[in-house]
Amino acid sequence: MEIQISVDKSDITATIQAKIDEIKEKAAAALYQGGELIATACQENCPVDTGLLRSSIEVEQISDTEVEVAPHTDYAYYVEVGHHTRSGSFVPGQFYMRNGTEESRESVADYIRSQLTE
């Protein structure tokens, strides 16, 4: 007695691909939202004079697996790491990006993990 079983691989392949696409979409969305959490923490740490620096901190989706959180002003770098004035004195850095990133690291990881395990 012989039993033959045949499986239509195209159905299985399509189902697997659909699930992979769904996971990729969820991961990209979770990553972007994680970037938003980091941006908010950086904005909260940002010193304010006119508010331009704080409002310039944005999230950009680079790819499905990468986001960039960055300020977009000419002077953001100098506020972050410090600088010398024309008279030669040193203005220390505020490290608002570094501190915001560090403060939000664990909550961002938890958020992304929770979105991918639903």
What are these regions (language model features)?
Residues 1-118:
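Short, Lys/Arg-rich flexible segments
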